[in-house]
């Protein structure tokens, strides 16, 4: 199989095979290393999309204990206020977090999104099969605020084909922002609301 022919379903089959053998820790390590291999392929211009990007560590390690944390309406209001107050928290980060909250997509689905996937006039995001976790293409409706946030993000993207291009020159061998960028940004926001119980970006989807 050619490297560009590897799809998320192949990664899923590989990880499930390891987990089914009773080795979830090994499956987690395999996911990390496989992700790095495909990232290297992107750096060397062998491919443009990492088929591992749709998978979280919990997908490799077997079933995760279900979290019951979600943000209440009051907490969401405080979150939006904190995003405007947090030192070093950019407008791009604010728009990104609002999109994650509104669309309930996985963070890597948004981090690696390209403008060609979006029909802003038709208010649809065409998420291609090679970037979805289950290997099926998905059409995601875009509410009016999301369309406006995306139009604003486009003004920040400097004609890049990526919705969220890498922001530092040393990181541009991977052309879009990495998913690890978002938890770091969220930590700046949480510092502005220390009395609110801990929450993660994954909790945005509940």
Per-range role (PLM):
Residues 116-118:
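A structural signal for short hydrophobic beta-strand segments in well-ordered beta-sheet cores
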Residues 11, 34, 38, 110, ...:
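Short, basic/aromatic-rich helical patch in the C-terminal catalytic core of site-specific tyrosine
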Residues 1-15, 68, 201-202:
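A Lys/Arg-rich helix-loop hairpin that forms a DNA/phosphate-binding surface
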Residues 37-41, 150-153:
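Hydrophobic recognition helices of helix-based DNA-binding modules
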């Amino acid at each position: 199989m050619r490297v560009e022919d590897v799809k998320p379903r192949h990664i899923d089959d590989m990880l499930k095979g390891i987990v089914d053998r009773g080795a979830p820790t090994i499956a987690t390590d395999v996911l990390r290393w496989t992700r790095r291999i495909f990232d290297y392929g992107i750096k060397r211009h062998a491919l443009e999309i990492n088929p591992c990007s749709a998978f979280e560590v919990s997908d490799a390690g077997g079933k995760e204990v279900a979290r019951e944390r979600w943000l209440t309406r009051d907490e969401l209001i405080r979150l939006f206020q904190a995003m405007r107050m947090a030192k070093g928290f950019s407008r791009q980060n604010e728009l990104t977090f609002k999109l994650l909250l509104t669309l309930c997509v996985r963070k890597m689905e948004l981090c690696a999104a390209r403008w060609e996937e979006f029909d802003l006039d038709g208010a649809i995001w065409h998420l291609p099969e090679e970037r979805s976790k289950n290997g099926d293409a998905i059409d995601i409706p875009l509410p009016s605020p999301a369309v406006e946030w995306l139009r604003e993000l486009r003004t920040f993207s400097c004609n890049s084909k990526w919705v969220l291009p890498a922001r530092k020159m040393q990181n541009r061998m991977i052309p879009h922002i990495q998913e690890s960028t978002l938890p770091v940004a969220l930590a700046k926001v949480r510092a502005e609301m220390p009395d609110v119980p801990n929450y993660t970006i994954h909790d945005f989807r509940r």
